[in-house]
Amino acid sequence: MADLKRTQPLARDAMAYVLAGGRGSRLKELTDRRAKPAVYFGGKTRIIDFALSNALNSGIRRLGVATQYKAHSLIRHLQRGWNFLRPERNESFDILPASQRVSETQWYEGTADAVYQNIDIIEAYGPEYMVILAGDHIYKMDYEMMLRQHVDANADVTVGCLEVPRMEATGFGVMHVDAKDNIIAFVEKPADPPGIPGNPDFALASMGIYVFKTKFLMEQLRRDAAEPGSSRDFGKDIIPYIVQHGKAIAHRFTKSCVRSTAENEAYWRDVGTVDAYWEANIDLTDITPELDLYDRDWPIWTYAELKPPAKFVHDEDGRRGSAVSSLVSGDCIVSGATLKKSLIFTGARINSYSTLEEVVMLPDVHVGRNAKLKRVVIDHGVRIPEGLVVGEDPALDAKRFRVSEKGICLITQDMINKLGL
């Protein structure tokens, strides 16, 4: 019987708990009205869909999402797109906003507190394992592989880790490991990150993914909640304590990342800045992008609105509706405009004689005639006035719009309104 249990998927005995309450302030105005996990990505999905899809594709059928900052857009998306799990099949999907369940504190105080405040719900479901996930990264990963390593090693916690160049790891929590990937120390954003044994130019950076046995995690959360000096955070409190007093191991992302081909690199992106967000979206327009959204074996689930197909109209010199090396979603009408290497979400209306190059356009944007836009991100519902030119004069752009370190313009409706056009 023990041998039979070893061959059965561990994911069916696990609950995935997604931490989705963060603002993501480095995305500037893109998160003024929505939490970072609710930000649109890839022409059809939201950022949170990747963590949830990984859980579902891995075989996990109990999902929870903790929300906090400006959660309406996120909650509405989850209600529409993730309501197909059924209790009668031993499945569940719970949206868990901060609600003063165990204290009179209105907000979740930290990532660990976001789990602790819902401890009664978790214990009622009774999963054997907990998979704690960050809801704001873009990647494809089979959590079953990480669960299996956790059980085989009889670990107290298993931490998902990325191999990154050592001097790029200063912005992460970094694992100091031995030759068997046992975690010796956990260092938060170190100035001099410890290297990997045998590969000293690289470091193991935390992905914000943790696997625990549920009973052990509940014990740690209750212990931490009783500590008056704790910040109630996994990275700052829970994980360092277990490293010091228990058994913590590192799980390398390369062991469980989902690739379309064996030659593909392990793809993981933190799209936490305007530059990173724009670049990750525009990368999808490549002939063979690193992130394969067309993989039928590992689909990214989301809310799919009932929309008509995209339409391209007019076929005259200088007024030809066309798109080259671009992704154009449903319910878009490209009317005599030219798109190059751009990603367009649903509901766009792009009018004649306009040219768009390397543009990321969120849903329901209207572009007037004769507009010229290059290297921009356009927020949801913006009305681009006729004849607007962006991307040719950096000094002028900086006076009117948000311009990133790498020269990407972020355009919102409030910025357009101030132009007085």
From Swiss-Prot:
Its EC number is 2.7.7.27. Keywords: ATP-binding, Carbohydrate metabolism, Glycogen biosynthesis, Glycogen metabolism, Nucleotide-binding, Nucleotidyltransferase, Transferase. Transmembrane segments: none annotated. Belongs to the bacterial/plant glucose-1-phosphate adenylyltransferase family. Pathway: Glycan biosynthesis; glycogen biosynthesis. The gene is glgC. Alpha-D-glucose 1-phosphate binds at residues 108, 173, 188-189, 206. It comes from Mesorhizobium japonicum (strain LMG 29417 / CECT 9101 / MAFF 303099). PANTHER family: GLUCOSE-1-PHOSPHATE ADENYLYLTRANSFERASE, GLUCOSE-1-PHOSPHATE ADENYLYLTRANSFERASE-RELATED. It is an enzyme of class 2 (transferase). Homotetramer. GO terms for biological process: glycogen biosynthetic process. One of its GO terms (molecular function) is glucose-1-phosphate adenylyltransferase activity. Involved in the biosynthesis of ADP-glucose, a building block required for the elongation reactions to produce glycogen. Catalyzes the reaction between ATP and alpha-D-glucose 1-phosphate (G1P) to produce pyrophosphate and ADP-Glc. Pfam families: Hexapep_GlmU (PF24894), NTP_transferase (PF00483). It catalyses: alpha-D-glucose 1-phosphate + ATP + H(+) = ADP-alpha-D-glucose + diphosphate. This is Glucose-1-phosphate adenylyltransferase. InterPro entries: ADP-Glc_PPase, ADP_Glu_pyroP_CS, GlgC_bac, GlmU/GlgC-like_hexapep, NTP_transferase_dom, Nucleotide-diphossugar_trans, Trimer_LpxA-like_sf.
